[in-house]
Amino acid sequence: MTKLNSDVLLANALRVIAMDAVEKAKSGHPGMPMGMADIAEVLWRHNLKHNPLNPEWTNRDRFVLSNGHGSMLLYGLLHLTGYDVSMDEIRNFRQLGSKTPGHPEYGITPGVETTTGPLGQGISNAVGMAISEKLLSQRFNQEGFNVVDHMTFAFTGDGCLMEGISHEACSLAGTLGLGKLVVIYDDNGISIDGPVEGWFTEDIPARFESYGWQTIANVDGHDPEQISAAIIKAKEEDTKPTIICCKTIIGKGSPNKAGTASSHGAAFGEEEVKNIREELLWSHEPFEIPEEIYEAWNFQEKGKELESDWNKLFSEYASNFPDLAQEYSRCMSMDDPNGLEAALLEFANSMQEQKLTVATRKSSEMVINVLGPLMPELVGGSADLTGSNNTNWSGTVAITKDNFKGNYLNYGVREFAMTGIMNGMVLHGGIRPYSGTFLTFLDYARNAVRMAALMEIPTVLVYSHDSIGLGEDGPTHQPVEHLTSLRTTPNIETWRPCDTVETVFAWKAAIQNKTKPTALILSRQNLPTIDRDINQVASINKGGYVIYESSNQPKLVLISTGSELAATLEAAKVVEDSISVRVVSIPCTERFDAQGKEYIESILGKDSIRVAVEASHEDWWRKYVGLRGSVIGMDSFGESAPGNVLADHFGFTKEKIVASLRNYL
């Protein structure tokens, strides 16, 4: 065998790290890291702007491993370039409490920009990051001071491009002309079930060309010169995103398994590991990296220099544009603007006095009109339902390819990509995105919502048309199980306000919450403002509170939310002639549960009979009403009819609630 050149030798270090880590864990995916090692070496050593000593540097290039099963490629890169990922962490790959989980996880491993694993979502995150970069550059950059100026790179595989979200996200990226987005496609022709020619035969360059992307096809993914030339060409194109299609061999270096599905998702085994070491001319022990290879890979000094140069630029920028510099720092730190809370509380009190009867989707629009002037970082959007979701406001300006000084994205009918893109925007920093669709279409976006919760990021999800109350469109559009789906997801707050006042507090929670996503569940139909005193208004922030009672020692406690609360309150005033009643509004069960046992019992009553009323699936409320209690809810899909007819048919009018209560009691 001939002597290896330096690029190949350094790439081989990535290969053996991945191979050894998977072998020790007895599980993992060595094939992709070994196949993409040459590409990763060229990108990370010669083209990626980053600082291992400060993974949070705001002007770093973003790198997303969309094909997250190949996580050991990323962990190897982070270790070799000098991030806080030790060889002991590499040895503990896929073990409890390590910094090297099976798939990359945001917040666990320094240098990991987003959690990936569900294929395709990383691409949507990368699109979101590129959108944020372009929005912030348009807002903050001044002549001679490009303080926001970085690339977003994403690795992707066949699986990502088979997933529908890749089509949704990449189509929009092309329409928006995201010139600083580069996707590198690992075209190895293999997936778990074998050669993809049996199920994935589309012309990827032609597909992306139709989206409006620059396509660089037929790059040898094991030739450093071809890879380098392609990346340079991609960075030179600033009017459209680029996909670089690299022909690679999965499991490259394995004499017996390279190019086969058997290298994808399992350890090679002791004998093949020995064969691979011989094939790669790698004589070192497992987890042993020669010092000269560490020296060649280490990026700490270069990264420190890159950030230092930017810091000098930003210091001059701050001297010339102090207000802009301060605002940039505020947005990147996700600090609330001055006066935000006071403005929202003043608006809530005003709405309590005015007692408007409006749909909570309209209430939400009214709140956005309060937030918008105070939060230039607020970027709205909708999946082609702007007029129905009421996600625009008086200051809405559409973001287009030719105008990135806007504040509103028309996502088109792309619910999944919309949510993944918002996640990427939040992860980038500097932007607070929100967007809307109908609650029933949560299902299209479900996994991206879950990923936001898993990553503990404050994506704001606006879901209108929240029940059978939407009426004639029928059961295809009437959510039943969706609230339960959201509420049973860890680390998300789901608010279903009953009127404008509760909607203000829902938005307040969404904006002030920095560690979890918030879902705002809004009605299509008009709802009256409920009577409250000042203490009740303040108690909304606790997620659940007493809205009405005929006795401070009630025998019957009625629990309700959203559009059913008003009818429940009316029903309580009918039945209170025969039993002492309390009505409790719980707009956010997660916030309510967090108040603790003592508060919960003080609101729900320790020994009271409890009945919950909500036009959603019944099961969620069983934990509140207990075995003695009852739920007036939905246990079937809806029907097509006017909303008021359906409310009567399914038992959510005052009269039907009264009848149900008397029958139960």
Each model region followed by its residue ranges:
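Thiamine diphosphate
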Residues: 95-107, 125, 131, 135-139, ...
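Cofactor-binding active-site loop characterized by glycine-rich and histidine/acidic residues
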Residues: 35-176, 392-393, 425, 532
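A short, small-residue-rich loop immediately preceding and capping a beta-strand
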Residues: 25, 61-62, 112-115, 143-163, ...
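N-terminal capping segment at the start of a domain
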Residues: 12-27, 186-188
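Glycine-rich phosphate/pyrophosphate-binding loops
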Residues: 51-52, 133-143, 427-444, 459, ...
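A short glycine/serine-rich beta->alpha loop
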Residues: 3-4, 21-30, 58-66, 109-120, ...
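Non-catalytic terminal/interface segments that mediate subunit docking, oligomerization
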Residues: 312-458, 536-546, 552-553, 559-562, ...
